Amino acid sequence: MTTNTHTLQIEEILELLPHRFPFLLVDRVLDFEEGRFLRAVKNVSVNEPFFQGHFPGKPIFPGVLILEAMAQATGILAFKSVGKLEPGELYYFAGIDEARFKRPVVPGDQMIMEVTFEKTRRGLTRFKGVALVDGKVVCEATMMCARSREA
């Protein structure tokens, strides 16, 4: 456990990510170290709009949105590690490998996303990500993002 903890509240997250409700999936950053790792939280509420159809009577947080939450966490880590983008630049979600879903996420859960920087090569940055609920893995994946000018 580090003694020099860095946290980010929602106001700071909104300065870094372009996402907004209902697609902002990071509520708070619990800890990070630039260029190394980030731990963030998503509080899963029954009021999420997608629960109306996924699934009526048995609400389950969509797996693709777990991946998106981890991708947003990697975006925050990238911004905090290499700085804000220049005008006309974006971080694009460029790929995902080895995604595995271990158990469902349901309303009332607090999902912790842990992402770690792996490497940058040819303009692509690779991260490992894991999402946990109550200390148990619900999803894991390798994700890539690319910094690029808007098309």
Swiss-Prot record:
Listed under catalytic activity are: a (3R)-hydroxyacyl-[ACP] = a (2E)-enoyl-[ACP] + H2O; (3R)-hydroxybutanoyl-[ACP] = (2E)-butenoyl-[ACP] + H2O; (3R)-hydroxyhexanoyl-[ACP] = (2E)-hexenoyl-[ACP] + H2O; (3R)-hydroxyoctanoyl-[ACP] = (2E)-octenoyl-[ACP] + H2O
**Class of this enzyme:** lyase
- Which keywords does the record carry? Cytoplasm, Lipid A biosynthesis, Lipid biosynthesis, Lipid metabolism, Lyase
InterPro entries given for it?
FabA_FabZ, FabZ, HotDog_dom_sf
Family per record: Belongs to the thioester dehydratase family. FabZ subfamily.
The record describes its post-translational modification as: The N-terminus is blocked.
List the GO molecular function terms: (3R)-hydroxyacyl-[acyl-carrier-protein] dehydratase activity; identical protein binding
**Protein function:** Involved in unsaturated fatty acids biosynthesis. Catalyzes the dehydration of short chain beta-hydroxyacyl-ACPs and long chain saturated and unsaturated beta-hydroxyacyl-ACPs.
Looking up Pfam families in the UniProt record yields: FabA
Subunit composition and interactions:
Oligomer.
Its Enzyme Commission number(s) read 4.2.1.59
Q: What is this protein called?
A: 3-hydroxyacyl-[acyl-carrier-protein] dehydratase FabZ
Gene3D superfamilies in the cross-refs: Hotdog Thioesterase
Location in the cell reads: Cytoplasm
Query: HAMAP family, per this entry?
Result: FabZ
* PANTHER family hit by this protein: 3-HYDROXYACYL-[ACYL-CARRIER-PROTEIN] DEHYDRATASE (PTHR30272:SF1)
Residue intervals passing through the bilayer = none
Q: What is the top-level taxon of the source organism? A: Bacteria
What's an example Gene Ontology biological process for this entry? lipid A biosynthetic process
Q: List, alphabetically, the GO terms of the cellular component aspect.
A: cytoplasm; membrane
NCBIfam families referenced in this protein's UniProt entry, alphabetically: fabZ, PRK00006.1
